[in-house]
């Protein structure tokens, strides 16, 4: 099965037997804490990093984000988020378009180094919202059902919440 940051899309729904959503995710913008960037408009003419072939890249390419994308100076496609974080630390890029759950992992490990661009109410500025699911072969109904049963048990006994809070600083799970 495919599990790591696997977003639900219509194309994947046709190709795979998808599980129930287990996590909600947003595509957000991560900047260095000491940067002057407060809004998407502040990034006009700046360089933003994005993991190649990711949901973050798709969000930047989406029609609803065209104005923001067109305002940027450059979009740099980076191999993975770990490299993108190094690039922002080094000042090679000004910001990262990134999965919120991945950003929260970095924030949880180094809370003074980064921040998420937020609106005036403190909510993360989101380029897109998505559900994380697990992709199984179309024929793997039995395995899918067992995994979903385990997810529901972990949700009901609080295990998912505990793990989520440990790694992301908050409960981002959606299984009921």
Regions from the PLM with identified roles:
Residues 37, 45-47, 52-55, 129-171:
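Extended ligand-binding regions for polar small-molecule ligands
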Residues 5-15, 59-63, 94-128:
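A ligand-binding cleft/hinge motif common to bilobed small-molecule-binding domains
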Residues 1-42, 124-127:
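Acidic, polar ligand-binding/catalytic clefts
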């Amino acid at each position: 099965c495919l599990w790591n940051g696997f977003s639900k899309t219509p194309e994947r729904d046709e190709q795979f037997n998808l599980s129930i959503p287990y996590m909600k995710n947003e595509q957000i913008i991560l900047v260095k804490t000491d940067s002057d960037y407060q809004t998407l408009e502040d990034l006009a003419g700046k360089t933003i990093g994005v993991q190649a072939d990711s949901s973050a890249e798709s969000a930047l390419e989406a029609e609803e984000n065209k104005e923001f994308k067109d305002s940027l100076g450059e979009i740099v496609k980076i191999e993975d988020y770990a490299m993108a974080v190094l690039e922002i630390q080094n000042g090679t890029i000004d910001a990262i378009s990134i999965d919120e759950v991945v950003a929260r992992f970095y924030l949880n490990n180094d809370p003074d180094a980064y921040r998420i661009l937020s609106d005036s109410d403190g909510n993360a500025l989101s380029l897109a919202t998505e559900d994380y699911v697990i992709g199984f072969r179309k024929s793997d109904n039995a395995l899918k059902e067992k995994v979903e049963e385990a997810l529901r048990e972990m949700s009901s006994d609080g295990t998912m919440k505990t793990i989520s809070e440990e790694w992301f600083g908050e409960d981002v799970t959606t299984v009921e």
